[in-house]
Amino acid sequence: MDVNPTLLFLKVPAQNAISTTFPYTGDPPYSHGTGTGYTMDTVNRTHQYSEKGKWTTNTETGAPQLNPIDGPLPEDNEPSGYAQTDCVLEAMAFLEESHPGIFENSCLETMEVVQQTRVDKLTQGRQTYDWTLNRNQPAATALANTIEVFRSNGLTANESGRLIDFLKDVMESMDKEEMEITTHFQRKRRVRDNMTKKMVTQRTIGKKKQKLNKRSYLIRALTLNTMTKDAERGKLKRRAIATPGMQIRGFVYFVETLARSICEKLEQSGLPVGGNEKKAKLANVVRKMMTNSQDTELSFTITGDNTKWNENQNPRMFLAMITYITRNQPEWFRNVLSIAPIMFSNKMARLGKGYMFESKGMKLRTQIPAEMLASIDLKYFNDSTRKKIEKIRPLLIDGTASLSPGMMMGMFNMLSTVLGVSILNLGQKRYTKTTYWWDGLQSSDDFALIVNAPNHEGIQAGVDRFYRTCKLVGINMSKKKSYINRTGTFEFTSFFYRYGFVANFSMELPSFGVSGINESADMSIGVTVIKNNMINNDLGPATAQMALQLFIKDYRYTYRCHRGDTQIQTRRSFELKKLWEQTRSKAGLLVSDGGPNLYNIRNLHIPEVCLKWELMDEDYQGRLCNPLNPFVSHKEIESVNNAVVMPAHGPAKSMEYDAVATTHSWIPKRNRSILNTSQRGILEDEQMYQKCCNLFEKFFPSSSYRRPVGISSMVEAMVSRARIDARIDFESGRIKKEEFAEIMKICSTIEELRRQK
């Protein structure tokens, strides 16, 4: 029978069918090989957009720098980065005029944060450029290495544990004539294996001291390492993203704290909120524009797209914004906040791994590291790569490219949103002084513009004025990729608005399925995803029921735990059948032990163990959840865990799910092969941190643990805490006198050891 596919949509409103056109099923594309080419593209493009600016040379590093600020006003529609300082400052002034006290209050909030933030804030985040080893590392390790090097160079302000004091060290480190660092290297040697008598290669890890002069250190401190952005759907070309080092991160964090605080107070800002809260906020702006456009006015909405947002933004402009926003604040605060944009004006982009060459005979492969691109003969490269290298050569220093203009992806999302909103804010009638007026929504580089006017000419004039105003601050609305509609239908940050936001369900598709953490977590995450989508994304009861059945099927195939009475043969079926036969109450078996599925859409909020507890045989209960059973993982004490789920766009989201510790919540062991590589030292460091932090948490259960604002080390804090707790326990009779004396003695010993050290 032939089915005409359009028949499927007869009963579906057009806006609900939008989901079906999204490229969100299946695996997203990943990048392979080196990101060097993409990074060179970014650097070259950024310079092209600002090419009419002024060239200068950085006196400290010798890097050539291009400054497009207050450059020529554009005469065509090509994207450009020539922001005008006075225009940006005026936009800020108007923003403050229409939101009295907004900057003042945000500064006060930020000042409090600056004084209280601990340096461990920087351990959050994934890969970070580690300047000591000149490559990426997990954030915690990169921070540890930085602090270790600082201490060995006599910079010790960071020992207070406050982020602001760590940043003092960073500032001082930049004035030092030289910095001594410890680098890791590998030695390979051939030795004869005693057992097999064969020759084997033995690797040993060495650490060696190395001195960096001021120039080399500054280049590293200002370096952003680059990688290729993975898993981007709906694009043919990959693009580069940057990861900054520890020197820059802390300063950026404070700037973004200030900008976040401002964004929270701006009704047009799509950041920092998300999800349903964001939808409600945005729907308000639309409602305002629609109710104000009485019968006499037309209202149109542009679904906006900006050309190369990051590459046309300029850190110097951000410096001007910060200078204005903080103008009545204490000097120290203004200084702390202006350092991030200054560092970004002098940033260097690391070109990544370099290029891989293969000989025609495919017998030889060789890596050309980025450092060699400045001097290598270009005859080995194809045309497009040759052009890239020729263009970037004047900018190269030690394998990094000087990149003064532009912002790199995702660094100042909040602050750039403030800039965008300040232009939307200029659309009020009292500022446009004509019949048209505008408002809109801004979230990083994404925007929606709502224009109201008495007639079509007015709408056109309003759009033109908005377009030109944006050009003055380095924002380039793309005329090709933006489109206009009667207000009531538009798209913003992948939310589709059609007289209210429509659920774009396809975006959630990638997060359905089995996560692959362990049997316990996967079951919990799977049902939580379905539950959340019923709440937030119009997942109807029938579809949810079907999703649940598909999930259980998927789960059983993943963990080979088909029901005990099934005919399917897997390598687990023998054990599971045996368990099935000797279990009296078969309904009590977990799905992962071959039991039946008791979930339906009404009880998705209950962890499976709790759902089946009353139905379980006693000895099964005893095995499953017995803390004395060595297979029961009790790593997590809280009852709520966090899983990382991948929505189709945007960063991975953290999602809470209920965690019940059972024999099924195992933690896979680390791959052993890492222990033979140069990463081994890092791993040991990481485990040491883990142990220290776990110990610290034992002393300060989260309920009583307020972040210390004073200055004391972790050890001192734990010792004083132990003394207080011991005294309370002794006085209330929970511990004996001897135990109390022993605890006090241990505490004194620890303090004595610290003094000797």
Curated annotation (Swiss-Prot):
Residues 55-64 have a biased composition (Polar residues). GO terms for cellular component: host cell cytoplasm; host cell nucleus. The keyword Nucleotide-binding applies. A motif (Nuclear localization signal) lies at residues 187-195, 203-216. Phosphorylated by host PRKCA. The keyword Transferase applies. Residues 50-82 are annotated as: Disordered. Residues 286-483 form the RdRp catalytic domain. It catalyses: RNA(n) + a ribonucleoside 5'-triphosphate = RNA(n+1) + diphosphate. It is found in: Host nucleus; Host cytoplasm. GO terms for biological process: DNA-templated transcription; symbiont-mediated suppression of host gene expression; symbiont-mediated suppression of host mRNA transcription via inhibition of RNA polymerase II activity; viral RNA genome replication; viral transcription. InterPro entries: RNA-dir_pol_NSvirus (IPR007099), RNA_pol_PB1_influenza (IPR001407). It is an enzyme of class 2 (transferase). Keywords: Eukaryotic host gene expression shutoff by virus, Eukaryotic host transcription shutoff by virus, Host cytoplasm, Host gene expression shutoff by virus, Host nucleus, Host-virus interaction, Inhibition of host RNA polymerase II by virus, Nucleotide-binding, Nucleotidyltransferase, Phosphoprotein, RNA-directed RNA polymerase, Transferase, Viral RNA replication, Viral transcription. Its EC number is 2.7.7.48. One of its GO terms (molecular function) is RNA-directed RNA polymerase activity. Influenza RNA polymerase is composed of three subunits: PB1, PB2 and PA. Interacts (via N-terminus) with PA (via C-terminus). Interacts (via C-terminus) with PB2 (via N-terminus); this interaction is essential for transcription initiation. Belongs to the influenza viruses polymerase PB1 family. RNA-dependent RNA polymerase which is responsible for replication and transcription of virus RNA segments. The transcription of viral mRNAs occurs by a unique mechanism called cap-snatching. 5' methylated caps of cellular mRNAs are cleaved after 10-13 nucleotides by PA. In turn, these short capped RNAs are used as primers by PB1 for transcription of viral mRNAs. During virus replication, PB1 initiates RNA synthesis and copy vRNA into complementary RNA (cRNA) which in turn serves as a template for the production of more vRNAs. This is RNA-directed RNA polymerase catalytic subunit. The gene is PB1.
